[in-house]
Amino acid sequence: MQFKYIPNILSFPRIFLAPLFMVFMFKDIFIYRILSIIIFFIGSILDFLDGYIARKYNFMSDFGRYLDPIADKVLIISAFLTLNLFYPMLVKSWMILVIITRDIIVTLFRFLLMNNNVVMKTSKYAKAKTLVQIILIHIILVMHLYNLALFPVLEQSIYYIMLFCTIYTLLTGIHYIKINLNHLK
């Protein structure tokens, strides 16, 4: 095995963990709730590891540049869609629509740039966005484990964090387009 493919090998499981995460979430039994947290946590760690290894050892590839953002979006959007079904007053449908629309536009823009031999690097703002999304999802999953209704103060906070996350996600999309638009000329 060539070590340069390790980041890609770490990206693939995230795509397959997403439906598994969703299945366990819908099995509304305590052990399955724990498994859904573990699955999402593993996906989050794999996201960190593939990027870290790719950058540290310069194991970046064109295929990985396509695969990694798609794997990220599949895992995170699957989590938000599932959480929307459980907590529609916290993770609102319009918020998910904004996040999905932004992700589709940025991903298509990234692919367009790649077809023009331009690599759109992940900005520190987008990395922060992903971190906030992952932390928020983990918090909701832990609260789901113990029944969210037991945390009324946190429940209100979660809504505002989700709102912030949605707005910040939109702003990072605008930022990406703005700083990379000149590469299309």
What are these regions (language model features)?
Residues 1-185:
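Alpha-helical transmembrane bundles and membrane-interface segments of multipass inner-membrane proteins
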